[in-house]
Amino acid sequence: MLNYDIAVIGGGIAGYCAALNAIEAGKKTVLISQGQSALHFSSGSIDVMAKTPSGERVEAPFSAMASLPQQHPEHPYSKMSPNFVRQSLYWLVDQLKEQGLPLHCQQDESNHHRITPLGTLKATWLSQPFVYQHRQNVAFKRLLFVAVDGYRDFQPLLAKDNLKKHPDFQHCEIGEIQVTIPGCEALRRNPNELRSIDIARLLKQPQAFNSLCHQLMKHATQEDLVIMPAIMGNGDGLVLLQQLRRQTNLTLHEVPTMPPSLLGIRIEEALQKRFLKQGGVLLKGDQVLSGEWDAQGHLVSISTRNLGDIPLHANAYILASGSYFSQGLKASLDKIVEPIFGLDMVAKPHRRQWRNDQFFSASAHPFMAFGVETDAMFRPSLNGQVCQNLYCCGSVLSGYDPVFEGSGGGVAVSTALAAVQRAMGLKQAMSVEEECVL
């Protein structure tokens, strides 16, 4: 039998944050991850709260959280103080900064808006260094979208047309720069075959990188905002972007593209390296299949696909297995389940109640708020019995819609730390009424 203090199930942002926080507290920690997480599909920014569950726009997320316990007691934020959520996010900033990936927020802790690949604006709270943080005033003479020849996952014409409709940008000239990356011809068999990873590898070559610099300087000036797809990554994306800024003296804005998202991959790689550097044990490419319980509701051990007959024991377990995309939740024709342990769920019983009649509805689809039911300590239940040493965090939780609210990142990080601290018996410092010290 393998023995640990804390075992974390899931390798997304919630899982890595939980595992890192546990190992910082001196706990022998293992993280079991099936493989690539939803971070490969993410924007690389951390959303905290763009809208309330009722649909009201939010500028100051921590102020908005204060009313959630009364209005939406089922929401994960209602089980933590706003100050704990805030400190959890700053903890993440410190962790990523140590790995060379700084994240930035506004000085007044309000939301800012990032320009999306579709040319819309999306509220978020933390962004990477080369993401333009828009509030209201635009200080640029022109906005120039970069179109890469042969790259199909970013459509500048669509983004340009959408951004022109926004009142904040109506006085700006919005244009397009067409660039060609040397070496692309050898990689593709048809005109639109390149992906972001392909271009990222090419731009490591000095000839390709210098050619991009020259083409950008030919069309853009220091008064412009150059909006380019995230095509620099594969381990050294920020280094190359800093070099690009030095050589061109241009203001750059990265937008995430169709998967794989290099902005999201940066966060996953940084968290993984941090966890391993701190001495954590990573079982990557493995899958938790089941658990063994005692009569009092304690999870005694878990079994994984790769370990076979060897059980894995821990004093406490953190379930950060994600939602539908990561198979932390599974939907069949007539029910939605948590597939590892069969935990009790919050979900509508009839399939017609899972969604709105209109796909592009102004209100949230109910199924997005389905998930595992937990108590105030983020402990789930199994057949009505509270699981004494299993804690849940991230998008496996019920009671919130991360897409509609724009709250996915904030909930993932804060509930991960809350789950770990409650697993270690620090629940008194975690109540909504009290301040939390990390």
Swiss-Prot record:
An individual GO BP term: glycerol catabolic process
Keyword Oxidoreductase: yes
Catalyzed reaction equations: a quinone + sn-glycerol 3-phosphate = dihydroxyacetone phosphate + a quinol
Cofactor(s) needed for function: FMN
Gene3D superfamilies linked: FAD/NAD(P)-binding domain
InterPro entries from the UniProt entry: FAD-dep_OxRdtase_2_FAD-bd, FAD/NAD-bd_sf, G3P_DH_GlpB_su, Metab_Enz_Cyan_OpOx_G3PDH
Gene Ontology terms, MF aspect: glycerol-3-phosphate dehydrogenase (quinone) activity
Sorted UniProt keywords: Flavoprotein, FMN, Oxidoreductase
Pathway assigned to this chain's UniProt record: Polyol metabolism; glycerol degradation via glycerol kinase pathway; glycerone phosphate from sn-glycerol 3-phosphate (anaerobic route): step 1/1
Record GO cellular component, one term: glycerol-3-phosphate dehydrogenase (FAD) complex
Superkingdom to which the source organism belongs: Bacteria
EC number annotated for this UniProt entry: 1.1.5.3
UniProt family annotation: Belongs to the anaerobic G-3-P dehydrogenase subunit B family.
Subunit description: Composed of a catalytic GlpA/B dimer and of membrane bound GlpC.
Function: Conversion of glycerol 3-phosphate to dihydroxyacetone. Uses fumarate or nitrate as electron acceptor.
Protein's name according to its UniProt entry: Anaerobic glycerol-3-phosphate dehydrogenase subunit B
